């Protein structure tokens, strides 16, 4: 369906962009000197299709610590248009704040409109493949009234950290006269929707940004990755985990959240938390520990172990004891909650630390967390989501729960996290606790595979999402007793569905969709490291069981989704619009256009990448 247009798009990016590089160098000279730009000797055939008084051309200046400045215009020729942009940028009051003469400090972006077409307001959508589809980062939108146009450029999705059409309309309507009528966003959008005076135009653009002495062609405002390779994979693992390490606090916590667009640490889910008491999450903290351990496996660099110990000590500091039938248990208690997943992932992290280093100094807590997980398996095998929750039973331990309370506190993901920790303990020790862990673990696995789909069917989605359970089953099947057909089928069925619901090279609506997941074909793509941890677990399981053909299929799928996720990495080249690119570089974002980073956005991608790398490459590690 999309092969022809994608082949054409890829062919465009395979061109030699030397003329654009030279153009941007000359633009820089003209910005500095004020001398008129001359481009008569440059051949832009196949690169720029300039239409007289139709092709809008923007020039934007970016510099660390400065708000970008830009100007766009349309003139009779490409050269006249660029000279107008240069003239107006030089007149900007903030222009003197930019070191336009320094290619290492001030980056210049050239963006020009292509494929402009008029649509009706009713056609505008972000779901359907039709004349009015708006694709964030690919399409721009123009509102025109009384001969005046207001533009949202495709690259605005990156520079403004937007994700959907509503954010586009909110931004655009504010620039129109409607923006002065009311400060309420909903009222502005309502006025726009009822106004017959505005014409709507969809368009795409071509964009190039300087990087030192080079120019980089952008797609969806981002640097393009066109093929999978292990060097890129490895470098993104180490660099992103180093970013987590470099941004750790003295008490062992990680920097939880970073907004690259605004250079702030306040996360979108907790915007009202004071700056001196920002939200933190103990479960995702443990994911950061696992990422550090993966980096240590790949490098044998002791700096990661030093950081792991600090992070584990913080987790111990928020752990509380309680009694169980197997002895003293410990659970992670933070934000007034005792989450099954919080203790489960902590157990995973501590077990991984023990297995990789052989250091048994946390053994009291490993056993304590194991006992806690076992104590949260209900008599029918259901894993209870919370031990303490402030909204239930006055925040007291949830020992006796009725059916309504169990359902209200059930988590789709916590059981898989807890079962992975339990499996790691059961498979690596031979004491009575390990035997009990196996017994309880089997009961819980039977329930989650057979009963959860019946009781909690509403929690299942078209695109499988329980990667933790896939990893847990991979671990449990190392014990021959647990190689049950229904367990194994769960992993491979979900993995096959994930592979089916992945955009491929020739069926991708946009060329960077290749390797991205979707719920329904046509969805905006999901470059998802968390799900991919389940996919790579299926690869390891297939190899362990000797299913070579399936393993090869899974390996290729992992490579494909990894290449897609390469685009989430904030490289020096791609961080051009960030307020503080020195700080954001080496981190990994949530989404393609949103510029939010969280410790788990790094952890999931880096851990998926690490396991994929280790599946095919030799690496230094302490223990098998």
Predicted regions and their residues:
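Solvent-exposed loop and edge beta-strand segments that line ligand/cofactor-binding
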Residues: 229, 267-286, 325-346, 359, ...
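Basic nucleic-acid-binding interfaces
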Residues: 2-212
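Extended, well-ordered alpha-helical scaffold segments
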Residues: 23, 226-244, 300-318, 358-376, ...
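Low-complexity, Ser/Thr/Pro/Gly-enriched N-terminal "stalk/linker" regions
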Residues: 214-283, 302, 307-310, 318-326, ...
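CBM-like carbohydrate-recognition segments
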Residues: 280, 500-624
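Domain-length accessory/inserted modules outside core catalytic folds
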Residues: 303, 322-335, 347, 351-362, ...
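Solenoidal tandem-repeat scaffolds enriched in leucines and small polar residues
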Residues: 369-449
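Well-ordered alpha-helical scaffold segments within catalytic/enzyme domains
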Residues: 221-230, 286-302, 345-360, 417-433, ...
């Amino acid at each position: 369906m999309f092969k022809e247009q994608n082949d054409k798009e890829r062919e465009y990016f395979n061109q030699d962009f030397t003329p654009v590089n030279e153009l941007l160098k000359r633009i820089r000279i003209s910005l500095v000197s004020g001398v008129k730009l001359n481009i008569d000797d440059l051949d832009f055939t196949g690169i720029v299709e300039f239409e007289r008084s139709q092709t809008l051309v923007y020039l934007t200046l970016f510099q660390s610590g400065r708000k970008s400045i830009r100007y766009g215009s349309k003139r009779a020729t490409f050269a006249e248009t660029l000279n107008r942009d240069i003239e107006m940028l030089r007149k900007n009051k903030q222009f003197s704040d930019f070191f336009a003469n320094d290619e290492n400090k001030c980056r210049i972006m050239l963006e020009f409109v292509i494929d402009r077409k008029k649509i009706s307001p009713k056609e505008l959508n972000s779901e359907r493949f039709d004349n009015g589809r708006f694709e964030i980062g690919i399409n721009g939108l123009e509102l025109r009234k009384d001969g005046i146009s207001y533009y949202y450029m495709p690259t605005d999705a990156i520079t403004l950290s937007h994700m959907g059409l509503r954010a586009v309309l909110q931004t655009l309507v504010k620039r129109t006269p409607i923006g002065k009528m009311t400060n309420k966003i909903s009222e502005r959008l309502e006025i726009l929707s009822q106004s017959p005076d505005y014409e709507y135009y969809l368009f795409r653009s071509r964009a190039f940004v300087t990087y030192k002495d080079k120019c980089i062609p952008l797609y969806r405002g981002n640097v393009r990755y066109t093929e999978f390779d292990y060097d890129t994979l490895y470098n993104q693992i180490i660099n992103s985990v180093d970013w987590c390490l470099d941004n750790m606090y003295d008490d062992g916590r990680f920097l939880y959240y970073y907004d690259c667009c605004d250079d702030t640490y306040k996360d979108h889910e907790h915007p009202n938390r004071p700056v001196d008491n920002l939200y933190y999450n103990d479960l995702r903290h443990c994911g950061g520990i696992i990422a550090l351990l993966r980096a240590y496996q790949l490098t044998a660099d002791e700096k990661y172990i030093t950081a792991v110990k600090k992070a584990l000590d913080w987790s111990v500091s928020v752990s509380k004891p309680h009694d169980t039938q197997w002895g003293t248990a410990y659970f992670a208690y933070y934000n007034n909650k005792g989450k099954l997943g919080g203790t489960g992932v902590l157990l995973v992290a501590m077990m991984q630390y023990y297995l990789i280093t052989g250091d048994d100094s946390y053994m009291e807590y490993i056993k304590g967390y194991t006992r806690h997980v076992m104590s949260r398996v209900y008599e029918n095998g259901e894993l209870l989501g919370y031990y303490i929750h402030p909204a239930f039973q006055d925040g007291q331990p949830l020992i006796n729960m009725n059916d309504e309370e169990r359902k209200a506190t059930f988590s789709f993901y916590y059981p898989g996290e807890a079962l992975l920790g339990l499996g790691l303990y059961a498979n690596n020790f031979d004491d009575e606790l390990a035997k009990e862990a196996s017994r309880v673990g089997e009961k819980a696995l039977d329930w989650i595979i057979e009963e959860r789909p019946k009781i909690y069917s509403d929690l299942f989605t078209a695109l499988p999402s329980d990667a933790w359970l896939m990893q847990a089953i991979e671990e449990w099947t190392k014990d021959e007793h647990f190689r049950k057909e229904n367990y194994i089928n769960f992993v491979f069925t979900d993995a096959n569905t994930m592979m089916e619901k992945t955009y491929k090279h020739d069926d991708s609506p946009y060329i960077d969709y290749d390797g991205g997941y979707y719920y329904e074909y046509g969805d905006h793509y999901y470059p998802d490291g968390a799900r991919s941890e389940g996919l790579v677990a299926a690869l390891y399981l297939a190899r362990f069981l000797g299913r070579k053909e399936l393993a090869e299929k899974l390996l290729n799928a992992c490579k494909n989704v990894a290449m897609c996720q390469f685009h989430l990495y904030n490289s020096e080249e791609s961080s051009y619009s960030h307020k503080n690119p020195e700080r954001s570089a080496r981190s990994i974002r949530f989404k393609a256009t949103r510029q939010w980073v969280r410790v788990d956005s790094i952890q999931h991608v880096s851990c998926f990448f690490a396991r994929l790398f280790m599946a095919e490459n030799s690496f230094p590690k302490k223990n098998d």
